[in-house]
Every structure is written in structure tokens, then in C-alpha cells.
Swiss-Prot record:
The gene is rsmG. This is Ribosomal RNA small subunit methyltransferase G. It catalyses: guanosine(527) in 16S rRNA + S-adenosyl-L-methionine = N(7)-methylguanosine(527) in 16S rRNA + S-adenosyl-L-homocysteine. Keywords: Cytoplasm, Methyltransferase, rRNA processing, S-adenosyl-L-methionine, Transferase. It comes from Rhizobium johnstonii (strain DSM 114642 / LMG 32736 / 3841) (Rhizobium leguminosarum bv. viciae). One of its GO terms (molecular function) is rRNA (guanine-N7-)-methyltransferase activity. InterPro entries: rRNA_ssu_MeTfrase_G, SAM-dependent_MTases_sf. GO terms for cellular component: cytosol.
Length: 205
């Protein structure tokens, strides 16, 4: 099996397939993603989310903010299972979604845990991480604000944020409050989308 042109092991493929089946089942009862995207689950969500790990395939500690339906947090945790290292802390305040995430991690034997708390409170439970991810949560300025407790003054912590066609405007807005190094990874799934890699964060105002 290939995702975004990269080979995926049979074990990881089976985990992803089990997650997809579980997702479809739970999505009938709770709103995990926009219903209009369910028919394109593999391309729109699983392949898209896989890009984060494919950009940074290291056995490290992640914090995934606003994990929702598990994109990209659970997908990253599934890939980490193959490496037998690293961990994903999934932060999701909605208790129904958090219950789904716990079930998904358990049934796929993925490397992660769920913190059913507000994003603003997550740093009190998870003090250290090497990478932060978020998808379809808020604009870049807001994401950097949420991530700042882990990233400010820490050269080894990076943010990986999925962004759509308005990402240049979001970058300009964020640079009004923050100074940071930036890499733009063009999406292999959506032509006008990117994954923004943020590092060396400093506060301006």
C-alpha cells in the first residue's frame, strides 16, 4: 500500500484500515468530520493526515491540539507504533470525541493517550514535547498562541500545521505578533494546501 507516493507496511496498513472502519462506525453517532467528506475518508483525511509523519518520521513526543476525529493525531500515533517509539498526546475537550479517540488508540495499538481538557490547560499535563500538530482548528496566529508554552525559547520543538489556500494571509497576520522560522511543505493531497513547519519561536508583542 502507498500513501502520498510512499510505501506503508502491511502492519500499518491494517491499523489504518481498522481505524477507518471504526471511524465510519462512530461517525454515524457523533460529528467527527463534515458528513460531506466521509465518502472520501482515505484521501481527504487519512492520506492528508499521514503527511505530518511523512515529513517528520521520528520516534518523538507529539502534542496534537484539538484532535477531534483523530486527524492527524491518531494517524501519527499509528505510524509511531511501527517505530516502537515516540508518543502522541491528543488534546480534545469534547468528551464524546475523546471517548472515540481512546477507543481508536486502544484498538489499533497506537502510541498515544488522550487528555480530555481545554487546549489552554494542556501544558499543565504535558510539559515537554518535540512536535505539535493541528488540523482544521484555528488560524496560524491562534495555533502559535496555543503552542507557545511548549515552543517559546525551545529550539528543538516544532509545529506542523495543515493550512488551506489562505495560508499566506495567515502567515502575515501571525508575523505581527511572532517571529519564527518557516518551512512550507506543499500538500501531496490538496493542490492549494500546505503544511507549515514552524520553529525557533519568539514573541514580538
Amino acid at each position: 500500500m502507498e500513501l502520498n507516493g510512499l510505501r506503508v507496511s502491511r502492519e500499518t496498513q491494517e491499523r489504518l484500515q481498522h481505524f477507518a472502519a471504526l471511524f465510519q462506525k462512530w461517525a454515524k453517532a457523533i460529528n467527527l468530520v463534515a458528513p460531506s467528506t466521509l465518502d472520501d475518508l482515505w484521501h481527504r483525511h487519512i492520506a492528508d493526515s499521514s503527511q505530518v509523519f511523512q515529513i517528520h518520521p521520528q520516534p518523538i513526543t507529539w502534542v496534537d491540539l484539538g484532535s477531534g476525529g483523530g486527524f492527524p493525531g491518531v494517524i501519527t500515533a499509528i505510524f509511531l507504533a511501527e517505530l516502537q517509539g515516540g508518543w502522541v498526546h491528543l488534546v480534545e475537550s469534547n468528551h464524546k470525541k475523546a471517548a472515540f479517540l481512546r477507543t481508536a488508540l486502544r484498538e489499533t495499538n497506537a502510541r498515544g493517550s488522550v487528555h480530555s481538557i481545554r487546549i489552554e490547560d494542556a501544558y499543565t499535563e504535558v510539559r515537554e514535547c518535540s512536535a505539535i500538530s493541528a488540523r482544521a482548528l484555528t488560524d496560524l496566529d491562534g495555533l502559535i498562541g496555543y503552542s507557545s508554552p511548549w515552543m517559546l525559547g525551545k529550539e528543538n520543538c516544532r509545529g506542523f500545521f495543515h493550512k488551506g489556500r489562505d495560508y499566506l494571509r495567515e502567515i502575515d497576520k501571525a508575523r505581527g505578533r511572532w517571529e519564527f522560522d518557516l518551512l512550507e511543505h506543499k500538500s501531496a493531497v490538496e493542490q492549494e494546501s500546505v503544511i507549515l513547519e514552524i520553529s525557533n519561536l519568539r514573541r514580538l508583542v
